Amino acid sequence: MKKSKLLISTIISLFVLTASSVNHAQEKDFDPEVAADAVLRSAGIDPDKSVANKAPASGFWTCHGIRMHMGVDMGSWTDLDTGELYTQIETGQIDEQDKDEKIKGTDYLYALTRNPAVIKYFIVDKSGKNLYIRDDVNIFKTYKCKRN
């Protein structure tokens, strides 16, 4: 999470640097690639290495009849039958003391990009390798997803 926030702030800094360097862009010795690398290196990020960390629960799944692909960083998922994209809007740890919750782990809430009123709830268990989808009507009922 820290790396993604750092990456976002670095990109914003890059845009600010680029905006302030518009006059310099006309010069032949200005290289935007070198400027971008310098900004990333000053933030402690090696631009030659990938910064995305693959979550164990990412990949292809079938959840209660929905064929889907969970994004590498769990930030989004795609319904493979309809092509619709859902993006993460909230995440949090499930309370260990909650007796209604049978599965303990991390709770994820996703909204459909073209209609944010359509939401889906997922749970990743403590091992990080098992994915569950919550029922749309009875929120305490969960279905285990199968890896494809």
From Swiss-Prot:
Residues 1-24 form the signal peptide. The keyword Signal applies. It comes from the Viruses. Keywords: Signal. Probably allows the phage to grow in a different host or environment or alteration of the cell wall or membrane. This is D108-specific protein. It comes from Escherichia phage D108 (Bacteriophage D108). The lineage of its organism: Viruses, Duplodnaviria, Heunggongvirae, Uroviricota, Caudoviricetes.
